């Protein structure tokens, strides 16, 4: 039977066992190397309150702290939430990260980004 992926969908080379992690979405237990991992970096303070805090602050240039969360998704939840997409057999060999769409102020894709995507 042919192999679908060279990595078997994992990042485990030469290790017998890998500790499991829990999916953020459905709590399914999956091996850590198989999980789809994303970093969620957000401001602790919401955007509406940033100005109020900066005006009330004693320090002139105080940098507000951020939360750093590492999110682990199982394959089915990552596909369902469109974190990763199903790709064709040829496209699966492409290891480069996909181009991120650039948005302008009106939340529309910029013409330069749309032109690149069309090529």
Swiss-Prot record:
Region Disordered, as annotated, extends over 1-20, 88-119
Q: Which PROSITE patterns match?
A: RIBOSOMAL_S26E
Cellular-component GO terms for this entry: 90S preribosome; cytosol; cytosolic small ribosomal subunit
Q: Which Pfam families match?
A: Ribosomal_S26e
The entry's keywords: Cytoplasm, Ribonucleoprotein, Ribosomal protein
The UniProt entry lists the main location of this chain as cytoplasm
Record-level Gene Ontology MF annotations: mRNA binding; structural constituent of ribosome
Membrane spanning stretches: none
Alphabetical GO biological process terms: cytoplasmic translation; maturation of LSU-rRNA from tricistronic rRNA transcript (SSU-rRNA, 5.8S rRNA, LSU-rRNA); ribosomal subunit export from nucleus; ribosome assembly
Q: Where in the cell is it found?
A: Cytoplasm
Q: What is its quaternary makeup? A: Component of the small ribosomal subunit (SSU). Mature yeast ribosomes consist of a small (40S) and a large (60S) subunit. The 40S small subunit contains 1 molecule of ribosomal RNA (18S rRNA) and 33 different proteins (encoded by 57 genes). The large 60S subunit contains 3 rRNA molecules (25S, 5.8S and 5S rRNA) and 46 different proteins (encoded by 81 genes). eS26 interacts with eS1 forming part of the mRNA exit tunnel. eS26 interacts with TSR2.
Tell me its family: Belongs to the eukaryotic ribosomal protein eS26 family.
The record's function comment reads: Component of the ribosome, a large ribonucleoprotein complex responsible for the synthesis of proteins in the cell. The small ribosomal subunit (SSU) binds messenger RNAs (mRNAs) and translates the encoded message by selecting cognate aminoacyl-transfer RNA (tRNA) molecules. The large subunit (LSU) contains the ribosomal catalytic site termed the peptidyl transferase center (PTC), which catalyzes the formation of peptide bonds, thereby polymerizing the amino acids delivered by tRNAs into a polypeptide chain.
* Record's miscellaneous remark: Present with 503000 molecules/cell in log phase SD medium.
What's the protein name? Answer: Small ribosomal subunit protein eS26B
Q: Which organism's genome codes for this protein? A: Saccharomyces cerevisiae (strain ATCC 204508 / S288c)
Q: According to the entry, what is the taxonomic lineage of the organism?
A: Eukaryota, Fungi, Dikarya, Ascomycota, Saccharomycotina
Provide the gene name from the record: RPS26B
């Amino acid at each position: 039977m042919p192999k679908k992926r060279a990595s078997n969908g994992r990042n485990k080379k030469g290790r017998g066992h890998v500790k499991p992690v829990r999916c953020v979405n459905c709590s399914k237990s999956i091996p850590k190397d198989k999980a789809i991992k994303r970093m969620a970096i957000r401001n602790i303070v919401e955007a509406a309150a940033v100005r109020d805090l900066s005006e009330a602050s004693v320090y002139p240039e105080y940098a507000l702290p951020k939360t750093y969360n590492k999110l682990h998704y199982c394959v089915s939840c990552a596909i369902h939430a469109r974190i990763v997409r199903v790709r064709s057999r040829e496209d699966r060999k492409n290891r480069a990260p996909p181009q991120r769409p650039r948005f302008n102020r009106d939340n529309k894709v910029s013409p330069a980004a749309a032109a690149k995507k069309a090529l």
